[in-house]
Curated annotation (Swiss-Prot):
<feature type="transit peptide" description="Mitochondrion">
    <location>
        <begin position="1"/>
        <end position="21"/>
    </location>
</feature>
<dbReference type="GO" id="GO:0006637">
    <property type="term" value="P:acyl-CoA metabolic process"/>
</dbReference>
<feature type="domain" description="HotDog ACOT-type 2">
    <location>
        <begin position="289"/>
        <end position="401"/>
    </location>
</feature>
<dbReference type="GO" id="GO:0052689">
    <property type="term" value="F:carboxylic ester hydrolase activity"/>
</dbReference>
<protein>
    <recommendedName>
        <fullName>Acyl-coenzyme A thioesterase 10, mitochondrial</fullName>
        <ecNumber>3.1.2.-</ecNumber>
    </recommendedName>
</protein>
<keyword id="KW-0809">Transit peptide</keyword>
<dbReference type="InterPro" id="IPR033120">
    <property type="entry name" value="HOTDOG_ACOT"/>
</dbReference>
<keyword id="KW-0496">Mitochondrion</keyword>
<keyword id="KW-0719">Serine esterase</keyword>
<keyword id="KW-0378">Hydrolase</keyword>
<feature type="domain" description="HotDog ACOT-type 1">
    <location>
        <begin position="85"/>
        <end position="209"/>
    </location>
</feature>
<dbReference type="GO" id="GO:0005739">
    <property type="term" value="C:mitochondrion"/>
</dbReference>
<comment type="similarity">
    <text>Belongs to the acyl coenzyme A hydrolase family.</text>
</comment>
<dbReference type="GO" id="GO:0047617">
    <property type="term" value="F:fatty acyl-CoA hydrolase activity"/>
</dbReference>
<comment type="function">
    <text>Catalyzes the hydrolysis of acyl-CoAs into free fatty acids and coenzyme A (CoASH), regulating their respective intracellular levels. Active on long chain acyl-CoAs.</text>
</comment>
<keyword id="KW-0677">Repeat</keyword>
<dbReference type="InterPro" id="IPR029069">
    <property type="entry name" value="HotDog_dom_sf"/>
</dbReference>
Length: 439
């Protein structure tokens, strides 16, 4: 067993080229971006996992042997710079028709669910580059997405006829967690890249058995811009803690929120009767319970990640597509995603599980639709249902949408939670204007 561990530890060098051609400044450059297909290839090389499902048990057993090589303290790990993790990835939709078919919608736009999958893979690769050990190719760490903090869209829709470029880098590091900033750009006719999306993910490093947290390399900012990014990462952490502490699952609504719920309740009472039991809908309104949509997926090995659990990007894609269908059927027109936020990956989804998704509109305002998707799995072995994720999506409809009214106290809490997420939007009125950027 020890010999097998040493064999894994001393695999050939050079699989991961590290930040070639990076230059000083706030915009880092590399000589050539990775093709989108290379992201998964490199991840499997770094982790040392076979592409064949029947080999997964042996591969994971071999990875467990790396546990003894993990550092006992972060102090022994060399610090990294932002440039060390910076990466560019090309999605050549304009020049690859077969790839384009995978991403195109029937409305001739780009499938946002596929973009979520790419962002998840890119975020993991960025973190592996930050923690790259030059003495070996195979990483001792198992890095997974723990939180999608925020994804802000800058455009209504994307063209499937033009190339897309992703950039990403680590922006903040704790002891075992890392914040990753990613941007997405699309090529225009003038040969410049225009911004499309800003994303912030939080990743966690675990040991080779995916059981315990593992230390990651510290991050040292090189200039003022990087110091501001690092400070923002600290603020983001504090904001997440405050948001979690004030969760409606832990504390009662504020006095203002209680008044909102009471006003909603009063507006649904039937004026013809003097009763709290007789409820009617106001004009241009819909009961929250009537907006639900559900789906079921069997988690096949094809959708596994490099650690042989279900790929987080797949879960996000399925949740987004159900949320989009919910917003579309509710609003009566094609919705556009504006913001994705606060997606916490609470439990991993094992291959073979049954994945249940439940989506409903929980808040509306003007043309905006706030959709919540609850994800749970049913294990065929343990016969238990477990919540794995809660997803929050903000859509904008082409026309004004009906108001949402809760009936029960539980639905009222969903309404307030949806309102909180809506208010946290970075661009609550209109999408940002286009402007060219050279990524």
């Amino acid at each position: 067993m020890k010999r097998a561990a040493m064999r894994l530890w001393t695999l050939n060098k050079g699989l991961l080229t590290h930040g070639r051609g990076l230059s000083q400044g706030s915009q880092y450059k590399i000589s050539e971006p990775l093709h989108i297909h290379q992201v998964q290839v490199k991840l499997r090389e770094i982790v040392g996992i076979s592409t064949v499902w029947r080999d997964h048990v042996q591969a994971m057993e071999e990875r467990k042997l790396l546990h003894s090589f993990l550092p006992k303290s972060q102090k022994v790990l060399p610090p990294r710079k932002i440039r060390d993790s910076y990466i560019e990835v090309l999605l050549p939709l304009g020049t690859d028709p077969e790839l384009r078919d995978k991403y195109v919608t029937v409305q001739n736009t780009v499938r946002f669910g596929r973009i979520l999958e790419d962002l998840d893979s890119l975020g993991v690769l960025v973190c592996y580059m930050h923690n790259h050990n030059h003495s070996t190719n195979m990483s001792l760490l198992s890095i997974v997405t723990v939180l999608v903090d925020k994804i802000d869209m800058c455009k209504h829709s994307l063209s499937p006829e033009q190339d897309i470029k992703f950039t990403g880098h680590v922006s903040w590091v704790g002891n075992t967690t890392m914040e990753v900033k990613m941007k997405m750009f699309q090529l225009h006719d003038d040969e410049t890249y225009w911004p499309v999306l800003d994303a912030t993910f939080v990743m966690v490093a675990q040991d080779s058995e995916n059981k315990r947290p593992a230390f990651v390399n510290p991050l040292i900012p090189e200039n003022k811009e990087e110091e501001e990014l690092f400070t923002q990462g600290e603020l983001n952490k504090s904001r997440r803690i405050a948001f979690s502490t004030s969760s409606l699952l832990k504390v009662a609504p504020s006095s203002e929120e209680r008044n909102i719920i009471h006003e909603l309740f009063l507006s649904t009472l039937d004026p013809k009767t003097i009763s709290f039991q007789s409820r009617i809908l106001p004009p241009k309104a819909v009961w929250m319970e009537d907006t639900k949509l559900k789906s079921l997926d069997i988690c096949h090995p094809q959708e596994r990640n490099v650690f042989n659990r279900i790929f987080g990007g797949f879960l996000m894609r399925k949740a987004y597509e159900l949320a989009w269908a919910t917003a579309c059927s509710f609003g009566g027109s094609r919705p556009y995603v504006v913001t994705v936020d606060d997606i916490m990956f609470q439990k991993p989804v094992e291959v073979g599980s049954l994945l249940f998704l439940s989506s409903q509109v929980c808040f509306t305002q003007g043309n905006y639709i706030q959709v919540r998707v609850h994800s749970e799995v049913f294990s065929l072995d343990s016969r238990e249902h477990m919540t794995t994720n809660v997803f929050h999506f903000t859509f904008m409809s082409e026309k004004e949408v009906p108001l949402i009214f809760p009936k029960t106290y539980g639905e009222s809490m969903l309404y307030l939670d949806g309102q909180r997420h809506f208010k946290s939007m970075s661009t609550p009125v209109t999408l940002k204007k286009d402007y060219p950027v050279e990524p």
